[in-house]
Amino acid sequence: MSAFQNGGIASRALDDDSDIEEEALANDYKEQVQYEGMEELEQVNSMSMAQQTDDIQSRLAAAAQPLDFSAPLEVKFASYDNYCSLFHFILNSDGPVDLEPPSYYWAWDVIDEFIYQFNSFCSYRNRVARQGTNEEEIQILREAPNTWGCYSVLNVLYSLIQRSQINEQLAAMKRNEEPMAVAGDYGSKSLYRMLGYFSIIGLLRVHCLLGDFSLALKTLDDIELNKKAMFARVMAAHFTTYYYVGFSYMMMRRYADAIRMFSHILIYVSRTKNFQKNAQYDSISKKNDQMYALIAICVAFHPTRLDDTIHTALREKYGDQLLKLQRGGPESLPIFEELFRSACPKFISPTPPDFDNPELNVDPLEHHLSIFMDEVKTNMWSPTVKSYLRLYTTMDVKKLAGFLEVEPEKLRGWLLVNKQRSRQIRWTDNGLLDGEVVNSNDLDYAMQGDLIHISEAKVGRKLVDWYLRNLARTY
């Protein structure tokens, strides 16, 4: 197997970017992940111990190196083969590989680059299929449907998690027990433990890219999102985790939880920008606009108080746009679409495209955008209706319909949908999917025949907390 191709590329920016099933994935990993060069891998046993160690160390270091986005197709294929070879060696050797990771962040770099190349290849393949103009590349891609396949990538991640027993270790730590007692021969090794841990973050990312947002959050059941978590030691992993958790919450209409996630990471970045002056931080800071765009969307759906730092930055970046989002109506639609396009991840399709019928291939981004915009249109008139309802304690449906110039029955249906939308699940404890149903609006109403009963519960601002918070910042 040839060495991993990296083309001498410098660090790239961050991309714009079941237990039974896990056991089955681990068992059939060897026969499902196919690649050329197996004979060469088997010859490693005949090498001297020094040569073998040097070769593996070089492959470990190479696996974390970024691949040029514009690399030719054969280089992308070779990169996939090299990853398969490396992961096969790590997972299927006779016993655990006795090697230490080159650095504490190496495992994250490997998983991050592995998923980045998978994401880039899928987007590239889908684009070639939709255009249908390059016959040579189409033929090459048609003959290799399993290269950078969704199943293979998920198989690697699940296998690393299962082999390292990382979920069992994290669960033991939650119970204040010794994780090494359940780690086993593989999980006790730093190489497997770190790869398994960051594979969980990788699964969050991949499931989100595939559009399965609930499964994305489910993968983090054993990871506690706090400053003591292992991912918080690596800035890029920290940022990525909160971005994808927040985005998954947003797509599940849990806007309060999404705002909490986005706020955490944006405040963290703003407070550490003077202490982290490196290429990694620079690449992350360039994605801040995406984070602010997403939080602007969430605040439009779920008006709430924000941290003063975020609120100020949001007004500076999206002043006029933010006002239009909050007013709703047809003029807000293009702004929602623009912000979503600029801030969403690069979605991918779980299956190879149809090269014979290019017109049948749907852009995954357009698919998720249409779902999102349907939700926007459902809530489009919410600010306008609320502005009328706030003026009354009781109101006739026909009267409100006259103000809005719509049919009473159409308005009745909208009011029922809007009331259902105002009930959100908000996280309280345990897993990220858990929580309790709360009323997300300060305005509530009930319908009795044609009569609307309105109640408003507005919590006054706690001035003491505000003064204490700002005094702490000043001094």
Swiss-Prot record:
Residue span, PCI domain: 257-451
Cell location: Cytoplasm
Record keyword Cytoplasm present: yes
Main subcellular location of this protein, as a coarse class: cytoplasm
Keyword Protein biosynthesis: yes
GO molecular function, one term: translation initiation factor activity
Cystine residue pairs: none
GO cellular component, one term: eukaryotic 43S preinitiation complex
Signal peptide region: none
GO biological process per UniProt: formation of cytoplasmic translation initiation complex
Keywords of the record: Cytoplasm, Initiation factor, Protein biosynthesis
Pfam families in UniProt: Paf67
General function of this protein: Component of the eukaryotic translation initiation factor 3 (eIF-3) complex, which is involved in protein synthesis of a specialized repertoire of mRNAs and, together with other initiation factors, stimulates binding of mRNA and methionyl-tRNAi to the 40S ribosome. The eIF-3 complex specifically targets and initiates translation of a subset of mRNAs involved in cell proliferation.
Family: Belongs to the eIF-3 subunit L family.
Subunit: Component of the eukaryotic translation initiation factor 3 (eIF-3) complex.
Protein name, UniProt field: Eukaryotic translation initiation factor 3 subunit L
Source species of the chain: Botryotinia fuckeliana (strain B05.10)
